[in-house]
Structure formats: structure tokens, C-alpha cells
């Protein structure tokens, strides 16, 4: 019994001396972090606080409003300047043509001597479009005639074994430069002569571009009938174009304000019109003589 009791005591003491728990792998520092986090806001709260401050700042709001206003004003200025130099509605007017108008206008350019009324027609102080008024200038015929002239020049150069992209490009650019120079000269002449009329840059560009029709007929006749045919066609188309330019420009430039003007101003208008007409044969010859040999 004693042995058993001693053994029991010894066993109980052995159980009370159990091995201590193993130390943790990481120290528990949650308490320290909790105290530190209490002093700093969360990341999301920082961003929200900055946005709220920006939106609530009157200086920032004023700057944003001013920037928006400046951008809107700049956009309006750009649109205004574009419409000042190139008006889409005005440009559409010069392309408002139909087949009947094109046929009649081409006949008028080739034989204008029997035409009587050269005044442009108006409806409620608005000029009628070209398809309703034969005397109204258009840009469709000059544009198509210029393209046809370039193609015809390429064919003529090819027949003469002188075709190259550089030469064809030089022909096209030279034809455009001459027309623009003529328009600038007319604008300067109208300004110096103090002519008050409804002629715009598009009107002058249309009248100046009608010479391409005579250039096409001259080159085509020269290719078919040689140099003799070329000079006959050149003389005919130049005379017809001169008559057309004199009658058209004189009627368009002589508005109601200029009819009762002084005699020197009327003489300047007449000289300007005659000078523009007399210049047409020289340009036609300069742009076409090298295409016919």
C-alpha cells in the first residue's frame, strides 16, 4: 500500500511539472499597431478629404469656371474665324447647278454675243442660285474644267512622249497660281477703285475659272487639227471670254450705289473690267501653247 501511495504521489508531482508551452513564432504587436492606427486616418479617408477640400475651395471653383469659360470662348472664336473665311452655305450656293444650267452656261461661254439680259436675278434681296439664274456665277464648271484640263494636258504630253508626273504637276500648279494671282489683282483693283458691289472672292474665282473651258477647247482642237486649228480656237474662245467677262463684271460691279458716282470712279471701273478681260487671252495662251506642237 505504501508503495502504491508513494507511487501515486510521485505520479501526481510528475503531472504538475508539465512542460511549458512553446514560445510563439511571432510576437503579438497588435496592441502597438492599434494605438498607432488610432492617430492616422485610413487611406480612403485621406483621398476623400482632399477631394472635398478641392471642391469646397472657392478659388479652385473659380479657376475651373474661368477655364471652362475661356475654352468655350476660344471654340466660338475658332468657329467664327472659319466661317469668316470659308462659309459652307455660301460655298454651296456656287455649286447649286443642274444639267440644264451647265449646258446653257457652256453655250453662253462659247457664244455670248446673242445674250441680252446680263443682270443677276434676286428673290427677296437674295440672289437666285445658278440653276435658276443663268447669269449667276458658279464654281462647278470651273472645277470640272480644271480637272479636265489637267487630264487633257497629261494626254497631250503623253502623245508627245514628254509625260512625267513632275511636268503634269507643274502644269496644274501653274494654272492654279495664275487664277489666284488674277483674283488677287481684281480684289486689289476693286479696293483701289472704291467699287461697291456684291462681288465676293468666290464670284471673282468663278469668273476667272471660266477660262479653263476655252483652254480645253483650244488644246483639244490643236490635238485634232494641229497648230492652225489651235490658233483659230484660241482666237474664238478668247474673244468670247473677253466679251463675257466685260458684260458680266461690268453689270455686277455697277451696283445701285455706283450708278450715280463720279465720272472718274466710273472710268476706273471700266478700265478695271477691260484690263481683266484683255488679260484672259494671254493667260490662255501661256497655259496651253506648250501642249500643242
UniProtKB/Swiss-Prot annotation:
GO biological process: endoplasmic reticulum to Golgi vesicle-mediated transport; protein transport
Alphabetical UniProt keywords: Acetylation, Endoplasmic reticulum, ER-Golgi transport, Golgi apparatus, Membrane, Phosphoprotein, Protein transport, Transmembrane, Transmembrane helix, Transport
UniProt GO cellular component terms: endoplasmic reticulum membrane; endoplasmic reticulum-Golgi intermediate compartment membrane; Golgi membrane
Listed InterPro entries: Yif1_fam
Localization, UniProt: Endoplasmic reticulum membrane; Golgi apparatus membrane; Endoplasmic reticulum-Golgi intermediate compartment membrane
Phosphoserine, modified sites: 12
Coiled coil: none
Topological domain ranges for the Cytoplasmic compartment: 2-138, 196-203, 250-271
Residue ranges annotated as Lumenal topological domain: 160-174, 227-229
Membrane association type: Multi-pass membrane protein
Modified residues (N-acetylalanine): 2
Disordered as annotated region, ranges: 1-27
Transmembrane intervals: 139-159, 175-195, 204-226, 230-249, 272-292
Alphabetical list of Pfam families matching this protein: YIF1
Subunit: Interacts with YIPF5.
PANTHER family in the cross-refs: PROTEIN YIF1A, YIP1 INTERACTING FACTOR HOMOLOG YIF1 PROTEIN
Family, per entry: Belongs to the YIF1 family.
Protein purpose: Possible role in transport between endoplasmic reticulum and Golgi.
Name used for this protein in its record: Protein YIF1A
Amino acid at each position: 500500500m505504501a508503495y502504491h501511495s508513494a507511487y501515486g504521489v510521485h505520479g501526481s508531482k510528475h503531472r504538475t511539472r508539465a512542460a511549458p508551452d512553446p514560445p510563439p513564432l511571432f510576437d503579438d504587436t497588435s496592441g502597438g499597431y492599434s494605438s498607432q492606427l488610432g492617430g492616422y486616418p485610413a487611406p480612403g479617408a485621406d483621398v476623400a478629404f482632399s477631394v472635398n477640400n478641392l471642391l469646397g475651395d472657392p478659388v479652385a471653383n473659380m479657376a475651373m469656371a474661368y477655364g471652362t469659360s475661356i475654352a468655350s470662348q476660344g471654340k466660338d472664336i475658332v468657329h467664327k474665324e472659319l466661317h469668316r473665311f470659308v462659309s459652307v452655305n455660301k460655298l454651296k450656293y456656287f455649286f447649286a447647278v443642274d444639267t440644264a444650267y451647265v449646258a446653257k452656261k457652256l453655250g453662253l461661254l462659247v457664244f455670248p454675243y446673242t445674250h441680252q439680259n446680263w443682270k443677276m436675278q434676286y428673290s427677296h434681296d437674295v440672289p437666285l442660285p445658278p440653276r435658276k439664274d443663268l447669269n449667276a456665277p458658279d464654281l462647278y464648271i470651273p472645277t470640272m474644267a480644271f480637272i479636265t484640263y489637267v487630264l487633257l494636258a497629261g494626254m497631250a504630253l503623253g502623245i508627245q512622249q514628254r509625260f512625267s508626273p513632275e511636268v503634269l504637276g507643274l502644269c496644274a500648279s501653274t494654272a492654279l497660281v495664275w487664277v489666284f494671282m488674277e483674283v488677287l489683282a481684281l480684289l486689289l483693283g476693286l479696293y483701289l477703285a472704291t467699287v461697291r458691289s456684291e462681288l465676293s472672292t468666290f464670284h471673282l474665282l468663278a469668273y476667272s475659272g471660266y477660262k479653263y473651258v476655252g483652254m480645253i477647247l483650244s488644246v483639244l482642237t490643236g490635238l485634232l487639227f494641229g497648230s492652225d486649228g489651235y490658233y483659230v480656237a484660241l482666237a474664238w474662245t478668247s474673244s468670247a471670254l473677253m466679251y463675257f467677262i466685260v458684260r458680266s463684271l461690268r453689270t455686277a460691279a455697277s451696283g445701285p450705289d455706283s450708278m450715280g458716282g463720279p465720272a472718274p470712279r466710273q472710268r476706273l471701273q471700266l478700265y478695271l473690267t477691260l484690263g481683266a478681260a484683255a488679260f484672259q487671252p494671254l493667260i490662255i495662251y501661256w497655259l496651253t501653247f506648250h501642249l500643242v506642237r
